[in-house]
Each structure stands twice: as C-alpha cells, then as structure tokens.
Regions:
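A conserved amphipathic terminal alpha-helix motif
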Residues: 106, 112-145
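Beta-strand elements of well-folded, non-transmembrane domains
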Residues: 12, 58, 98, 113-115
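Hydrophobic/aromatic beta-strand elements that line small-molecule binding cavities or substrate pockets
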Residues: 6-8, 62-68, 91-98
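Glycine-rich portal/gate segments that line the openings of hydrophobic small-molecule binding cavities
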Residues: 38-85, 134, 138, 142-145
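Short acidic/polar mixed-charge low-complexity motifs
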Residues: 2, 58-60, 88, 103
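Hydrophobic ligand-binding cavity/cleft-lining segments
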Residues: 1-44
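A short, structured loop/turn motif at beta-sheet edges
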Residues: 14-15, 68-72, 96-106
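One face of beta-strands
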Residues: 90-92, 109-111
Length: 145
C-alpha cells in the first residue's frame, strides 16, 4: 500500500478552518483544483455514506464516499470510488487540531491506496504536493498564512 502524509499550520482558529472544509460537497469553495461538485441522490453532505461526484478544472471526474465525519474531533474520512488516477482501496482522512499557542490550526491530510508499483512514486507526489498541499495553500490564502 502506498501512503501519503502532508501536514501544515494555518494561521486561523480550528473552528474557522473546520467551517470552511466540513461540507463534503464544498470542495469548489476552497480547493482550487475542483470546478464543481454535487452529492448524489440529493442526500445531505454530512451523511456518512453519501457520495460526492465532482469535476476537476482539467475536466477529470472523481466520485468519493464519505466514510466518517466528526465535528467534535474535526475530521473527515472518505474513499475514492472512481478516479482517473487508477488507484485501489483509496482511503483518506483530513484532520484538524487546534494549536492553542496563537489560535492556529494544525492540519493533516493522509491517504493509503494500492496502485501499480511503477506508479507509486508519481501518485504519492501528485496527491501529496498537488492535491493535499494545494488545498492547504489555498486555505492559507483564504483564511490566513
């Protein structure tokens, strides 16, 4: 299994960051790579088991299932159902932890997945630097550096 782990600190209170990212259907509002998103079958976006179907700005389409969501622990876990990345058993978690020294937020985004061995390094870099760090950088621009 390939593993990706990216962390950062956002200069904004955890509650403010969580309010921005909590909506499982809200990626277009904060992640620059996502053009549009919808929750299938009209389900609530915070219902565990709901499926988001979103389109990236490059035209690619991805479907993901919400596996876990906690307002108390400020995390979201999801799996990829369909993706052009050709990964298997992809499960990721985005987690926030309050940093009380300065009222900042420690953010972590991790994933595990299966893929062809010759693609592992490329996928780890694309997901880590492009998707995860790209999302963190956008949140920093929107909420504080």
């Amino acid at each position: 299994m390939a593993r990706v782990y990216i962390s950062s600190v956002i200069a904004a209170p955890a509650a403010k960051v969580w309010a921005r990212i909590r909506d499982f259907n809200g990626l277009p509002a904060w992640h620059p790579a996502v053009a549009e998103s919808r929750i299938e079958n009209g389900e609530p976006s915070d219902k565990v088991g709901c499926i988001r179907d979103f389109r990236l700005r490059n035209g690619d389409r991805i479907r993901e299932r919400l596996l876990g969501l906690s307002d108390y622990d400020m995390f979201c876990t999801y799996s990829i159902l369909e993706s052009p990345m050709r990964v298997d058993n992809y499960v990721a978690t985005l987690r926030l932890t309050p940093v009380t020294d300065g009222d900042r937020t420690f953010v972590e985004w991790s994933a595990e997945f299966g893929c062809a061995p010759e693609r592992e390094s490329e996928l780890v870099t694309t997901i880590g630097a492009g998707v995860f760090q790209g999302g963190f950088d956008a949140l920093k621009r929107q909420l504080g550096g």
